[in-house]
């Protein structure tokens, strides 16, 4: 990995790698605003699930970036599915140490792009920052479900499929 000096600025990274992931949703405002909008269908409720992956805890430093991206997205999407919901989009937060290269970030964005297409979702917004600690990636999946129909963990019983 290269150092942060060889990486584009935060705003250039967003423009080059992440705005393309947000183009299909008008509410994402091409990531130029601090908030995104998302309509929920009449008679539905919104679902949210957030997960964080930390280098050295949830993945190894040499794991392929595209696979880390897919893991990050899928752990939150699986929570929505377990609740009976349909995914609509996601928010992404990246805390990047200086040794993360632009090539690593390109591969990470490509992994997100692949899964976005498969799950018919889009990036809605997020945050990027630098850190002196480990690479830390957080994702909040956003979905919807008919009002009152969310499947809760507290309602599970032995033998449920």
Question: PLM features: what roles do these ranges have?
Answer:
Residues 1-67, 83, 92, 114-115, ...:
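Extreme N-terminal cap/leader segments of soluble proteins
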Residues 7, 42, 74, 149-153:
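Arginine residue identity/basic-tract feature
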Residues 46, 53, 88-161:
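Glycine-rich anion-binding loops of enzyme active sites
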Residues 31-33, 76, 87, 134:
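Short Gly/Ser/Thr- and Asp/Glu-enriched loop/turn motifs at secondary-structure junctions
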Residues 72-83, 119:
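A short, N-terminal amphipathic alpha-helix
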Residues 37, 76, 84, 123, ...:
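Residue-level signal for inorganic ion chemistry
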Residues 12-16, 75, 79, 111, ...:
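Alpha-helical scaffold segments in soluble metabolic enzymes
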Residues 27-29, 60-77, 99-110:
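Glycine-rich anion/phosphate-binding loops
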């Amino acid at each position: 990995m290269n150092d942060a000096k060889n990486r584009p600025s935060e705003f250039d990274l967003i423009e080059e790698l992440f705005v393309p992931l947000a183009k299909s949703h008008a509410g994402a405002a091409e990531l130029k605003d601090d908030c995104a909008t998302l309509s929920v269908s009449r008679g539905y409720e919104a679902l949210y699930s957030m997960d964080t992956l930390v280098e050295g805890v949830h993945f190894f430093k040499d794991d392929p970036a595209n696979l880390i991206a897919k893991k990050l997205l899928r752990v939150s999407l699986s929570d929505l599915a377990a609740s009976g919901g349909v995914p609509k989009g996601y928010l992404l937060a990246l805390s990047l140490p200086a040794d993360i290269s632009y090539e690593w970030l390109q591969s990470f964005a490509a992994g997100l792009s692949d899964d976005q297409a498969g799950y018919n979702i889009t990036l809605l917004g997020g945050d990027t920052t630098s850190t002196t600690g480990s690479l830390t990636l957080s994702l909040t999946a956003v979905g919807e479900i008919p009002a009152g129909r969310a499947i809760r963990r507290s309602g599970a019983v032995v033998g449920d499929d």
